[in-house]
Regions:
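Bacterial N-terminal signal peptides that target proteins for export
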Residues: 4-9, 13-27
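Sec-dependent N-terminal signal peptides
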Residues: 27-33
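Sec/Tat signal peptide C-region and signal peptidase I cleavage site
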Residues: 34-42
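A contiguous strand-loop segment
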Residues: 43-141, 161-313
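Short, well-ordered beta-strand elements within core beta-sheets of diverse protein domains
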Residues: 145-151
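Glycine-rich, aromatic-lined ligand/substrate-binding cores of catalytic
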Residues: 242-394
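Substrate-recognition/cap regions that form aromatic- and gly/pro-loop-enriched pockets
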Residues: 341-479
Length: 566
């Protein structure tokens, strides 16, 4: 087994941090340190209430899946502005200038999709009725996220800020589901415009119970909601009346379904979107079989918005779920002909295709090759904000990403998570984590089951090290925080940067290792992390894996006697 240098790198990290702390006259025992110690978006959000998590955290995840999206870690430093300052708004997807709005007098530090008060926002686009889009609006869904994070201290405050913004300036985007979370509660808010030239939006927000899990994945999921439960439900005053006016609904209020009115279900919404929610529910409840007929189109009875899990989920459980390809379920795509000889659980886009006039489809799992970035956000009410909020962040496909800890107080993001050297979606850089992780994953995709084991070893070693180090690092940060907040923030910023850089360096080494080991379709022999040599010092003989028996049988069936040895 190849030994990745994470422990050496982590030792370097601890040494640097120790020096950092010594400068502030805090003496720590080295033994304690070592004991502590690694197009339209098509996205997925997973949700875990604080009483459904193993450690009392609220947990939400987000994969930003889009061809064209460069994976980077955004940063908006805290700032103050004079009264009357204007903020230019650019569409997140395209960079198109949309207009100006009044800037807040005070904004908060935002790193990625979490702010310094542990408030986190994710999203998935459901589109909905196309006639409701308003191209005259100034606020797009991406701007709502990052402006909302810069101005809020709680999830409820975000909801008010976001809905006030679209009411005042107009909503530019399609229908959107937002996950809005803080250390105490998680909300799902769904929003759609009112049509060209009509300012504002119709929306509803529902609080996820603390003991439940939930998810959304590019299809509106809020059906009926309790209009009298002001503590757990918020909505625009015209959410029902507007649907009646447009002819989308003609029943009584209690029967109103936001989803059916504004985002009617079709095949793609069911199979490509709701199926990802089903996979999550199937994994962590005993009710997956009950919901499968809905995914297969045999019933129109929707899945519940939230469910109670059969056991409490850890942050690592959610990280692993973001790597899901329906393995072991009726929707598993790793064992049919489309998986090829090496059982790849990926399918190239487009999802739909035609053969002889008949339309077919490929499954769309949670983990997908076109992810720009992915995160699992951990928010904890029992810890101070600078320590309690951790954005476990990775770039590219979650299946082959490494989630590194990014603390919400960080005042500087790792260089490898930026547009270093001018890197973007069409500009490669050897110093960009997005491109290094894509380099590795695109080597693995064609020979998946031959190569994924090497990726898993490195991935597991990194993530296990970071997980095991978390408690000790946070104890150190808490001691600093008690004496000097700036010192604690600097320490966690330094830790955030060094873990990302060590991961980046390791992945570069992994890439070179994979090229050597699997070059030209053979496999080099490895022993104790080193490539083997023979008795005279030359490279040992290679292994020729060939093709699996099942693939060869299908190959002969397709080609007949063409390749028969006679």
């Amino acid at each position: 087994m190849k030994q990745w240098p994470v422990k050496a790198l982590f030792g370097k990290l601890l040494k640097v941090n120790h020096i950092f702390i010594m400068k502030r006259r805090i003496i720590l025992c080295a033994a304690v340190l070592m004991a502590a110690v690694a197009n339209t978006f098509a996205c997925t959000n997973l949700i875990v209430g604080k009483n459904a998590s193993a450690d009392g955290s609220t947990i939400v995840s987000y994969s930003a899946d889009s061809y064209g999206l460069f994976g980077e870690l955004y940063h908006y430093p805290a700032a103050t502005y004079p009264k009357g300052t204007m903020l230019k708004v650019y569409e997140w997807d395209t960079g198109k200038y949309l207009g100006e709005i009044e800037q807040a007098r005070q904004t908060y530090n935002v790193v990625g999709n979490m702010n310094e008060y542990q408030v986190t926002i994710g999203e998935t686009t459901f589109g909905g009725r196309p006639e409701l889009a308003d191209s005259t609006g100034i606020i797009d869904y991406g701007s709502l996220i990052y402006i909302g994070l810069q101005r809020s201290r709680t999830a409820r405050e975000v909801i008010k800020i976001m809905t006030d913004l679209v009411q005042q300036y107009g909503y530019y985007s399609e229908g959107e589901s937002f996950t809005i979370a803080d250390p105490n509660e998680i909300w799902i808010m769904e929003m759609i415009g009112k049509g060209p030239g009509i300012r504002g939006a119709v929306w509803v927000a529902v609080r996820v119970p603390d003991d439940c899990i939930s998810a959304h994945a590019n299809q509106s999921r809020i059906h009926q909601f309790d209009m009298n439960d002001k503590e757990n439900c918020m909505y625009s005053p015209d959410v029902v009346s507007f649907a009646r006016e447009k002819g989308y609904f003609n029943g009584v209020n209690k029967d109103f379904s936001f989803s059916l009115a504004y985002a009617p279900l079709d095949f793609g919404a069911r199979r490509f979107c709701e199926a990802r929610v089903w996979s999550y529910f199937n994994k962590f409840t005993d009710n997956g079989k009950d919901y499968l007929p809905y995914i297969e189109g045999k019933t129109n009875t929707p899945m519940p918005l939230f469910v109670k899990p059969k056991h409490k989920l850890s942050v690592q459980d959610v990280k692993d779920m973001m790597r899901d390809h329906y393995e072991g379920t009726p929707l598993d795509i790793s064992n049919d002909f489309g998986a090829g000889p090496y059982k790849t659980p990926y399918r190239l886009s487009p999802l739909n295709f035609k053969v002889d006039g008949q339309e077919y489809f490929n499954e769309r799992p949670i983990s997908t090759q076109q992810s720009g970035f992915v995160f699992v956000a951990q928010m904890r009410a029992h810890k101070p904000d600078p320590i309690g909020g951790v954005l476990w962040f990775g770039v590219d496909d979650a299946n082959m990403a490494v989630f590194t800890p990014v603390y919400c107080c960080a005042t500087k993001v790792p260089v490898c998570y930026t547009r270093v050297d001018g890197a973007d979606y069409i500009t490669f850089s050897w110093n960009s984590a997005f491109w290094i992780f894509n380099w590795v994953s695109n080597m693995v995709y064609p020979r998946y089951d031959l190569m994924i084991g090497d990726v898993r070893e490195a991935q597991k070693e990194m993530e296990t090290t970071f997980n095991n180090a978390q408690e000790g690092i946070e104890e150190m940060a808490a001691k600093l925080l008690a004496k000097d907040k700036n010192a604690a923030v600097d320490f966690l910023t330094n830790y955030t940067n060094m873990t990302a850089q060590s991961t980046f360096d390791t992945w570069k080494q992994l890439g070179t290792f994979l090229i050597v080991k699997y070059n030209d379709g053979v496999v080099k022999r490895v022993k104790d992390g080193q490539f083997e040599r023979n008795s005279i010092g030359q490279p040992a003989g290679v292994m020729r894996p060939g093709y699996p028996k099942e693939f060869l049988q299908e190959y002969v069936k397709q080609t007949g006697d063409r390749y028969l040895v006679k």
